[in-house]
Amino acid sequence: MPSSEVLRLAHENNATFTEFLIADLICSIYDNMTARERRRPIIINVPVNLRQFFPSETTRNFFCVINVEYTADKSECDFADVIKKVKLAFESQLTKDNIQGIINKFSVIENNPVVRVIPLLLKIPIMRFSSYLADCKNTSSFSNLGRIDIHENAAEYINMFDVFVKAKRPQMCCCTFGDKFGIGEDGQLVNKEIERSFFCRLADMGVDVQIISNLSQFEM
C-alpha cells in the first residue's frame, strides 16, 4: 500500500504512523472478541529502537519493549478514542527516563548475586517459564522497522520489502521502501478475521490495499 496515503490518514487523526496502525490493530482485535473476552485489556507489545535515546554503533538488536494497553469502556470500539489512548501510552512510556528505568530493572536482575549463582540447569527453565507468563498477558505485537534505504544502483531492481517473524499469536511487522509500505502478518491461527478487519478498515478509509497470502482460501 502507498505509505503516503497511510501517513496522510495518520496526520488527519493527529497521530504518528505507528500510533495510527496500532489503533487500527486494537479495533480489529476488539471487533473479533466475544463479550467475555472484551472484559480483559488488549495489550499490544511494541519494540522500541533504543538508538534514538542512547546512541550506539552496535549492529546487534538494540531495543526494549513497551506495552500499549486498551480497555474498552463502551460497547463499541471508537477509533478516535483508541487513538487518544494509544498516543497517551506512547507519550508516557517513550521518554528517556522511563526507558532507562526498564533497562535498569533488567540489569538489576541480571547482576543480582543470588541469580548469578543459580545453576544454568535451573536458571534456563525458570527464565523460560517467566517469559511464558509474561507473554501470556500480551494480545498481539506490532513492530515498525521504519524506512529501508538501499543504494540507488540496487534500488531500481527491488519492488518492495516484507518482514515476517515467528509468532505464537497474531503479530504484524511493517517497513517502508520508497512509497511502498508493506505489513507482514504471521501467526499460528488459520482464522484471519482480525487481519481482514485491519485491512478492510484501511481500505474503507481510502487506502489502496493489496493482499498477498499463502492461504489459498483467504479472501478479503
Residue ranges and their predicted role:
Residues 1-34, 183-185, 192-195:
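Acyl activation and transfer enzymes in specialized metabolism, enriched
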Residues 30-220:
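Acyl-thioester-dependent acyl-group transfer interface
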